[in-house]
Amino acid sequence: MLASRCCMLFVCAATVVSSVVAGDDVAQAQREKKFGEALSGAVLVGTFSIDGVKTDKLRLPERYELKSVKKTKDGLWTFMAHVTYFKQDVTLPITVPVVWAGDTPMVSLSNSTLPGLGNQLSAKVIFDGGRYAGTWQHGKFGGHLWGKIERADVSKSKPATEK
């Protein structure tokens, strides 16, 4: 009798857990679809800082024009991007890991190499509504980055430094 009850409890628990997991998978697929659609055709227009460098008077603009953003496999996403900061002005595919903190996506690079951008790159960048923010490290240099997510046609109005 006890074995029968334990077996029944296990079957019920397995059914509940599998339906919750299936629901989580559906919700995650919806979040990923929304993330890809929100960033494809968007422009990240913002500012970055360099630790140890006074930026009160010197605003360091950055601009990432995202042609497309697609999940590839195993948590990796490819951002087809035109990148502009400092003397960088390149268009290239950037494949990076994206992890999720609940419903919030975050690019999570750790001591990585990105073709066209260099090596020893680390970044943790979250995307929340119409904003992005995070930290970055490139070799000995690092800092913060933050800005707005705009549609490509709207963002051509003013560079980040003319606010």
Task: Name these PLM-found stretches.
Residues 7-18:
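Bacterial N-terminal signal peptides
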Residues 1-4:
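N-terminal secretory signal peptides that target proteins for export/translocation
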Residues 20-23, 27-29:
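Boundary at the C-terminal end of the N-terminal hydrophobic targeting segment
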